[in-house]
């Protein structure tokens, strides 16, 4: 299907019975909506539940999520860089996932991934069905119209895939996401997925993670007391959000 490459597992983002069986795609198809911070939170959520996690950063131009996690010496965390700009990149991703069947997969999707996802979406879904994996998507949005337009375009390709839309509360309270809240896109989302609220975190925490390129796991013991307390508050709220979408992992 990708020429000489062999299709195998793809990314599903469902926890259901086992963390290791899901493949997550934090997306949004544009920059600046909070996909990277969401990926930080999702990896932390999995590690806190002792799941095996395979982090794949597809933003090869600015792989901040990869750089923040690659030096963590944890036996249950693997980190990879993988461009999805062409067919070979998608095939490489599938081969990587096949090699780690007992790992939950977190894909930090680059903003430019929309075009290739549209091109290879049907192949991806077919591969998942063959491997008996289920695809679910986290779609992070801000309050702008293009977030809704990009979501609608994505829904046209992935009509049968559960999509969890995450209102990034950094951009305002949930009630202020007027265009999404009253949209037909939301109605479609909530037939198979959920509308979630991704909690805002204090600037001092975000600055610490980004400026030092540190994972949550590595940063926590080094933070000043107040910063660490805010991080812990935010982690707790994020965990409740992930539990509601994925089911409590055990």
Feature locations, PLM:
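Extreme N-terminal, non-catalytic leader segments
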Residues: 1-23
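A general structural motif
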Residues: 21, 50, 102, 132-134, ...
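A conserved segment at the C-terminal end of the G1
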Residues: 37-52
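Conserved catalytic-core segment of NTP-binding enzymes
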Residues: 112-207
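NTP-binding/hydrolysis catalytic cores, primarily Walker-type P-loop NTPases
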Residues: 209-250
């Amino acid at each position: 299907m990708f020429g000489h490459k062999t299709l195998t597992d793809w990314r599903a983002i469902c926890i259901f019975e086992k963390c290791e069986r899901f493949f997550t795609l934090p997306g949004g198809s544009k920059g600046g909506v909070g996909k990277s911070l969401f990926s930080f939170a999702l990896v932390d959520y999995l590690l806190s539940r002792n799941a095996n996690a395979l982090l794949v950063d597809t933003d090869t131009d600015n792989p901040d999520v990869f750089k923040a996690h690659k030096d963590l010496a944890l036996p249950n965390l693997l980190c990879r860089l993988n461009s999805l700009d062409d067919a070979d990149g998608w095939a490489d991703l599938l081969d990587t996932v096949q090699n780690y069947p007992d790992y939950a997969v977190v894909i930090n999707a680059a903003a430019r991934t929309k075009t290739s996802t549209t091109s290879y979406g049907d192949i991806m879904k077919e591969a998942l069905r063959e491997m008996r994996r289920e695809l679910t998507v986290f779609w992070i949005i801000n309050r702008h119209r293009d977030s809704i337009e990009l979501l609608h375009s994505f829904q046209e390709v992935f009509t049968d895939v559960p999509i969890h839309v995450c209102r990034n509360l950094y951009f305002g309270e949930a009630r202020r996401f007027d265009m999404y809240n009253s949209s037909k896109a939301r109605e479609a989302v909530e037939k198979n997925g959920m509308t979630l609220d991704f909690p805002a975190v204090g600037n001092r925490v975000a600055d610490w993670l980004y400026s030092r390129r540190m994972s949550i796991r590595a940063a926590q013991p080094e933070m000043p007391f107040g910063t660490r307390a805010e991080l812990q508050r935010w982690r707790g709220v994020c965990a409740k959000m992930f539990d509601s979408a994925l089911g409590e992992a055990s």
